């Protein structure tokens, strides 16, 4: 999968297991950390169950 899809998988996993992102945004020099933080932060407000279902649907679509 491409990077955007991998970030979405990461974000949905974090949202399903941890909930809304409350972590401090990584510094400008940490491009990977910032991309992951932004992806997770875009899921803010999504319930754990919804995030789990979206994660499953996305993984199944890759098969």
Q: Each predicted region: which residue ranges?
A:
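A charge-rich, low-complexity, intrinsically flexible signal that marks solvent-exposed coils, linkers
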Residues: 1-63
């Amino acid at each position: 999968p491409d990077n955007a899809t991998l970030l979405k998988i990461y974000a949905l996993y974090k949202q399903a297991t941890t909930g809304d992102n409350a972590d401090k945004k990584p510094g400008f020099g940490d491009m990977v950390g910032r991309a992951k933080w932004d992806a997770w932060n875009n899921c803010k407000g999504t319930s754990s169950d919804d995030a789990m279902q979206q994660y499953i649907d996305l993984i199944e679509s890759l098969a």
